[in-house]
């Protein structure tokens, strides 16, 4: 069976991405990261998602000394959602470069054909490492800088959500039976999602767009009157 490394944070997007890889017939090798993020609950979610798919191995990589972000530095406040067009303080320096590099090394070892990453350039927070040009550049690195690449057996970087809105992503998750009830998206990392941070707001807007009820609990839920049937467990 063909193998794929899946970058699994425990959030909505990475879990949907996992469902896409599963449906495509890949043997799944999820990779999660503890980089000192304040929302440690996502690691619990990632474990639950991996168990749901009965994967052979779920690896957790610890990366120390990652800073300069509201997600890793308690002295920087996580802001509520804004649309000012600026790169927000929740940007983690070089995060996807680090994650993909680890996934690439792991992928070469296990003989993976693909690496799945759940990034989107549509409904996203403005992070530069979530854009198509970033993925194209990293694929070039894979092609010219690895044994697999130069021998003609390159590892494909797949981002199936890249051009999907959050609502379209949620619809895809529902179609694939993705376990979104296990996921968390909140940057603040409380027992309940805050409902007002950038990530929560995009998630709630997506469920509203999809006409599907979000299966997780929020402190501030906003107007959810347009939601209909919840995703099934």
Curated annotation (Swiss-Prot):
Zn(2+) binds at residues 186, 194, 197, 200. It is an enzyme of class 6 (ligase). Pathway: Purine metabolism; 7-cyano-7-deazaguanine biosynthesis. Its cofactor is Zn(2+). Keywords: ATP-binding, Ligase, Metal-binding, Nucleotide-binding, Queuosine biosynthesis, Zinc. It holds the Pfam family QueC. The keyword ATP-binding applies. It catalyses: 7-carboxy-7-deazaguanine + NH4(+) + ATP = 7-cyano-7-deazaguanine + ADP + phosphate + H2O + H(+). Gene3D superfamilies: HUPs. The keyword Ligase applies. One of its GO terms (biological process) is queuosine biosynthetic process. InterPro entries: QueC, Rossmann-like_a/b/a_fold. One of its GO terms (molecular function) is zinc ion binding. Transmembrane segments: none annotated. Its EC number is 6.3.4.20. ATP binds at residues 8-18. Binds 1 zinc ion per subunit. Catalyzes the ATP-dependent conversion of 7-carboxy-7-deazaguanine (CDG) to 7-cyano-7-deazaguanine (preQ(0)). Belongs to the QueC family. Homodimer. This is 7-cyano-7-deazaguanine synthase. It comes from Desulfitobacterium hafniense (strain DSM 10664 / DCB-2). The lineage of its organism: Bacteria, Bacillati, Bacillota, Clostridia, Eubacteriales.
